[in-house]
Amino acid sequence: PFIKVPIAKAKIYFKQKDKFKVESKGIAILPKQGMSDLTGFLSNEKKYSAVLGEAKTINEHKTRLISILPTDENSEIILAKVYISTSEDLIYRTVLTTKSSGTVSIDYEYNLNKKYGLPNKMTFTVDIKKFKMPKSVASDIRNNDKQKKYKDNEKGTIVLTFSNYLVNKGISDDVFKKD
């Protein structure tokens, strides 16, 4: 395994359209790609073209693929594949290919907050060789694991489980200011 991080509890704040913040007392490793990149990318319809694709069943949900291509050649996102339920209008999988971090696949599971389109679980699969770690964590790993060479196709998994959602409660912009 690349790194096994103990389970961490965190508070995640999100405010439309592009404000995102994580507060955690321990180590919380989140993929930069996927959490807010797709939301920001999709917020401007002039920045991409979308093409309807194949039907595919994901975890017993019938979905349709929408391939999203940037119109800006300098976009960090090269391709976004979004699998959306045909009956619920929920995303069940996204596959983001980026210039700097390779491919990140995200599977979504829903329960109580399904009506808001908010998942209770997200499972990220990342390219280990291209995944960007925080510098302090990456430094420790490199010092402890100098002999390990990661293959081009080696994958890592990050699982986020969400609970205690507070929806539409209003968040001050001050929450998102850097300390």
Task: Describe the residue ranges of each PLM region.
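Flexible, processing/modification-adjacent segments and terminal tails
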Residues: 3-90, 98-102, 176-178
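Gly/Pro-enriched, hydrophobic low-complexity segments
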Residues: 62-174
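Short consensus segments that form the blades of beta-propeller domains
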Residues: 2-3, 151
